[in-house]
Structure formats: C-alpha cells, structure tokens
Amino acid sequence: MSRDASHDEPGWIPYTSRMSPVTPPSGTADRIRGGKLSGFWQRISEGRRLDELWLQFTADARASYGFYMTDAVAEDMVNRRGRPRFVRIAKTLFWSLVMKLTPARRVLLILAFVLLVGSGFHFEFGNDVKGDFNFTFVTVMLLLLLLALELADKVTMKRDLEIAREIQTWLVPSKPPEVAGADIAFASRPQNSVAGDYYDAFYPTLSAEENGKLMLVIADVAGKSIPAALLMATLQASLRTIAGEGSPLGELIVRLNRYASAHSLDGRRFTTAVLAEYEPATRRLVYVNAGHNPPILRRANGATEKLEAGGLPLGIDAGAVYETAAIELKSGDALIFYTDGVVEAFDENAQEFGNDRWLDAIRALPDWGAQESLQFLMKRVDDFVGLTRQSDDITCLVVRSK
C-alpha cells in the first residue's frame, strides 16, 4: 500500500543541498565580533559551519590530489631511475601543475617563484651602497593576477556548463508519464554539471500511446562531463528516431548498436544500456540489456531477480547479436533500473557501497509508491557516502506495479 514517506524518509538530497547554509555555531559568532566582520564571514562562508567548511576543503583537496597524482604516478612508472621516488613525484606534480597553464601564465608563475626566492637577499657595493632585495609585494600581486585569470576562465566555463546542463535537461523527461497499473519515478545526480547518464520513459509512437505500450530506458556513456554528455545527446536522438518507426525491440537494439558503432571512435566511446517495453494490459515487460548493470526485479514476497539477457555494450561491435527476454510484473512488484554510479559510490574510507548493500536496500523496500521507494533507496546511498564528493553520475529509475 502506497503511503507518503515525506515525514519519515528525507528525499534524495543533492550534495550541494546537504551542505546548505546554516547559522554558524555560537563559538564562531563570539570570535567574529562586530556587524561588518560578521557579515563578511557570512558572505564568504555562506553561513556554513566550520566543520562543514573543513569537510568541503578536504574533499576538494582529495579530488585535486587524485587529479594531479594520476600524471605523477604514470610518469614515475615510466622513469624509476635516478632520484628518490618522493623527489620524482614532487617534480612531476610541479610540472603537471605548471603545464596545465597557458604559456603566458607559466611565465608569470615562474617569475613569481623567482622573485619570491630572490626576496631577502642582502647586497653591498663598496662602503656606501647597500640594501636588501624585497619583491614580496610584487610576488603577491603576480600570484593574485594569476589567480584572477584562472578564476575568470573557471567562471566562463561554469557558465557554459550551466547552459549545457539546461539543454541536457530538455533531453530527459521532467516527470514520469502516467501508466495504467504502474507507478514510475526517476532521478539523476550528475557528478559534474553535465552527465553521461541517460534515462527515459516515453511512448515511441502514437499507436503505442493509444495501446499504453511504454518504452523505458537507462544508459551510461563511457567517460564523464562534456564528451559523455554529447554522446548521450546523440544516443537519445537516434533512439527516439528508431523507436518512432515502430521497430520491435530486438531490431531496435541492433540498429541502435550499428549507429553507436559508427560513432564510437573505434570502440573507445561505448554505451551500456537497458531498453524495455512495458504493456500495461498484460503487465508484460520485454527487455534487452546491452552490457549494463542488470535491473533488479523485487517481487512482492521479497525475492529478487536480475534482468541480464542481452549482449555487448553499444558501440563495441557493429555485428553484435542481442537476446531479448520477457517478465511479467505482478501487483506489489518493484523493478529498479540504475547506473554503476550507485553501486560504485564510496565513503570517506574509499569503501564502495557495492552490489550487496544495494541488494539489501532493495530487499528492505517498504510497500510504498515509486517516488517514496526511490527516496528510500537513494537515502541508503547518501547515508553510506556521507559528505564524500561524488565520483560518478548516479541515476535510478523505479517502476512499482500496482
């Protein structure tokens, strides 16, 4: 029996909302006296507590360390001779940072370092001419200029990503369609501004809508951010076009794979996906799994089944053969589609949420509606992850049979 869980289970709260502005603790307010200083602190901290700011800083530092260490470790694997490993990695980290700047900004950074090292040197010429070199002010100004240039680039990129994110939201449904005998809910949380995950629920043709035959899709493009988002957009367009021709599911997946293979950069840009057709009149669901995390069917009695029939991910082999399969949904059943970002989410100890915890969460699902079930599952993930920075796109689609 469906019920409103809003008072019992919080909804799926994005990372940024989970660190929402709050009033600083009294100890902080006592230390920051005066209206202007207090207002300044509120402005730069957005009202977040010191422990939240520290968690955010450590998450940023950990992500940056991992980003730069990728180059450092790769370089160290190639060149192991000579200096101690610490020195080699420190050198590689330095050059990894420097070479990510434009040539002009590299010159500014090196000049600032030279002036910083040169500051404090004492000089004498004869008995009358003596003094100290002090370029601290010039060094600070150069570093501030470099920071301003980098921030300008970041703000511009962020604005472009926000526009891309807005466009991407047009490609996925804003709300689930109404389906006789079933309740549907979905949600997606990108790691970055744009995502490589794709979900959909639509009637491919007018006759399908009249018959109530619904297409359900979840997919995950290899890679992240802009490249994955662009490939996701082409996948969505080609899927809708082919599905609109009324092709059977087995033929649809073959044609979609051929298209994906022709635009996969020799198999480097592949896509995992699950496509399903649901007929409310018979409660029959036909599906095909193209190398994706298998959707999990939880029966009303608590038993679980994995939907694994299918074939290779899209875009790897243009001649791949796919197998379709069918299941029958019964009253009280729940079908959960999800991407690998769910099971690969990790906590502050770098421990993955994993398939076992995910299965346990699905087995523990109360007899609620699709939206409440979705919130229940995602809360399990959020409780495990805490405030650890998200490492991949997370998408989930839930179908509850009435």
What are these model-predicted stretches?
Residues 12, 21-36, 53, 325, ...:
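C-terminal catalytic subdomain
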Residues 75-153:
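Alpha-helical transmembrane segments and their helix-membrane boundary motifs
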Residues 6-9, 260, 264, 345:
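Intrinsically disordered, low-complexity Ser/Thr/Pro-rich tracts
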Residues 2-103, 371-383:
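Non-catalytic regulatory/interaction regions at protein termini and inter-domain linkers
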